[in-house]
């Protein structure tokens, strides 16, 4: 396999994700229509050169190097394809805010895998990219929907293979995501969780997840209300999110069917019917204002196509 010519460009768009949705800890996630865009260019130099230029929505520019997740993912592709590394530049337009529980790390991993693979004319199948993405991230709930799109349930089978189920999401159910101007790292959010939980809590979550998935499939309000409930991670994480429980209560009082921490937080996901969306969004923002936290709460539709790439220039 030959190294791509200098100047070849690939555009990759990767959706944000909301993980867990309450009871689906580390196994359930949904892609949302907020995207990061990556432009990969083959540049002069060897595999130890990787230039990452990031432009955020506020116009700020940041730079990153070989320690970045995008580059680490690209390296995994080269290793798996038995390909000699080559120099890459990645320009990123950031719309997914980092450390907010919206899968920003997953977008970096997925983009690095797809970009490096596509610029070499895709020697690795999508199944292999999924395997590499889960290996890098350590859990599947963000990277799988980020790559595939839609609502995805991922579990390791008795044969130790990853099994992915694309679940239905009824058109009548909409997502409002309250995104605060505060950050919370995944590592910090995981530190507060216990290593062991009562079996009764595990059983409760299994039942809740079943109710939630059936409610989302049928658009059944009551099943969603009863299923969007968690005892494995949220009881320990709410204390890390300033004003979070008040935001949840405000969303439910405004008509949300259910409310949960998005991923590791601090963003908060509310599921509702379209006619309640505006009231839910406003209530969540106002509740955070009372705690001294600025936020925004946009409607984010389910993104069903997953990550996409296109060739901008072949040389």
Curated annotation (Swiss-Prot):
Transmembrane segments: none annotated. Pathway: Amino-acid biosynthesis; L-threonine biosynthesis; L-threonine from L-aspartate: step 4/5. Keywords: Amino-acid biosynthesis, ATP-binding, Cytoplasm, Kinase, Nucleotide-binding, Threonine biosynthesis, Transferase. PROSITE patterns: GHMP_KINASES_ATP. It comes from the Bacteria. It is found in: Cytoplasm. GO terms for molecular function: ATP binding; homoserine kinase activity. Gene3D superfamilies: 3.30.230.10, GHMP kinase, C-terminal domain (3.30.70.890). Pfam families: GHMP_kinases_C, GHMP_kinases_N. InterPro entries: GHMP_kinase_C_dom (IPR013750), GHMP_kinase_C_sf (IPR036554), GHMP_kinase_N_dom (IPR006204), GHMP_knse_ATP-bd_CS (IPR006203), Homoserine_kinase (IPR000870), Ribosomal_Su5_D2-typ_SF (IPR020568), Ribsml_uS5_D2-typ_fold_subgr (IPR014721). Coiled coil: none annotated. One of its GO terms (cellular component) is cytoplasm. Belongs to the GHMP kinase family. Homoserine kinase subfamily. Catalyzes the ATP-dependent phosphorylation of L-homoserine to L-homoserine phosphate. This is Homoserine kinase. It comes from Prochlorococcus marinus (strain MIT 9312). The lineage of its organism: Bacteria, Bacillati, Cyanobacteriota, Cyanophyceae, Synechococcales. The gene is thrB.
């Amino acid at each position: 396999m030959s190294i791509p010519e200098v100047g070849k460009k690939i555009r990759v768009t990767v959706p944000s994700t909301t993980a867990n949705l309450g009871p689906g800890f580390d196994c359930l996630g949904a892609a949302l229509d907020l995207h990061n865009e990556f432009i990969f260019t083959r540049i002069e130099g060897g595999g130890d050169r990787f230039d990452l230029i990031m432009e955020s929505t506020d116009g700020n520019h940041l730079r990153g190097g070989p320690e970045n997740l995008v580059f680490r993912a690209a390296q995994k592709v080269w290793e798996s394809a038995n390909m000699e590394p080559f120099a890459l530049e990645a320009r990123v337009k950031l719309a997914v805010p980092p450390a907010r529980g919206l899968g920003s790390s997953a977008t970096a991993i997925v983009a690095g895998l797809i970009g490096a693979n596509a610029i070499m004319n895709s020697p690795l199948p999508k199944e292999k990219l999924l395997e590499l993405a889960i290996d890098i991230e350590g859990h599947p709930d963000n990277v799988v929907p980020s790559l595939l799109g839609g609502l995805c349930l991922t579990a390791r089978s008795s044969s130790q293979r990853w099994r992915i189920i694309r679940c239905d999401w009824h058109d009548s159910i909409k997502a409002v995501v309250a995104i605060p101007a505060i950050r919370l790292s995944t590592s910090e959010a995981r530190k507060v969780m216990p290593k062991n939980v009562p079996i009764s809590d595990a059983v409760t979550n299994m039942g809740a997840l079943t109710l939630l998935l059936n409610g989302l499939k049928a658009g059944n309000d009551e099943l969603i209300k009863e299923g969007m409930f968690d005892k494995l991670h949220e009881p320990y994480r709410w204390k890390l999110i300033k004003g979070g429980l008040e935001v949840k209560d405000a969303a439910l009082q405004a008509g949300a069917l259910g409310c949960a921490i998005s991923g590791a937080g601090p963003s908060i996901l509310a599921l509702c019917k379209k006619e309640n969306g505006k009231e839910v969004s406003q209530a969540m923002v106002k509740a955070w204002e009372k705690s001294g936290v600025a936020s925004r709460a946009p409607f984010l539709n389910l993104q069903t196509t997953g990550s996409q790439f296109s060739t901008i220039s072949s040389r």
